[in-house]
Design a protein with these regions (language model features):
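Membrane-interface helix-loop junctions and terminal tails of multi-pass membrane proteins
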Residues: 1-89
Length: 89
């Protein structure tokens, strides 16, 4: 089973890849839908540090999960960008 932090990293990477590669609103919405459907059960599918902070303040995310989630999302965003750079060479 995938760990929730790894799911956040993968989901954010997939979403940022689609955002940087296409910029198409329909593709971004479809990518977000797929990421939420696949990762939501495991991690809650925040895929965005702002959403993570909002979930924390709403009491839906524990204090111990906030920093690892945000770090995973930052790494995932950078990884998605780097993948796009490699594909567009």
């Amino acid at each position: 089973m995938l760990h929730k932090y790894f799911v956040e990293l993968l989901g954010t990477m997939f979403l940022s890849f689609v955002i940087f590669a296409t910029g198409n609103y329909l593709a971004i919405g479809a990518a977000l839908s797929v990421a939420v459907l696949l990762g939501g059960v495991i991690s809650g599918a925040a895929f965005n540090p702002a959403i993570t902070i909002a979930l924390f303040y709403a009491g839906k995310l524990s204090t111990n999960d906030v920093i690892p989630y945000i770090l995973a999302q930052i790494v995932g965003g950078i990884a998605g960008f780097e993948l796009v750079k490699q594909f567009l060479k």
